[in-house]
């Protein structure tokens, strides 16, 4: 594997993809190994858009617009306060897409759409997790509802329920 292993604890959806099959219901049914093409992008330009922007950027932009109410385009970055407004919107959304698995040449094992993340790294390999506190936060902060809102904005349904995911990455 890689020379820098990391373990991440997420609360969210395991979307699959990368080197594994997608765990998304909205996939083309006429392909042996279907790729997720987001329904909100032009299908004729989809392959180029996914290759140029990658799923991380596509998902972030969509969640910023649909969940965070931030519709300024990146081209507008010269406006005064753009990055402060963008950062505030990202914080409001509170959900992001992460990759996991072995990442040679940007190949990944899959994607997780998550609302919570903590990690264990080689310098601090033991990390105590207070699951009772996290479960309290999950309920109080309505993580499931917020994740469902994000999935609705992305116009996808995961074939697996949201939950706690322990994933490894190697860089």
Segments (PLM) and residue ranges:
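Acidic (Asp/Glu-rich) sequence patches and key acidic residues
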Residues: 1-152, 156-157, 170-171
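Core of folded catalytic or high-affinity ligand/protein-binding domains
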Residues: 162-170
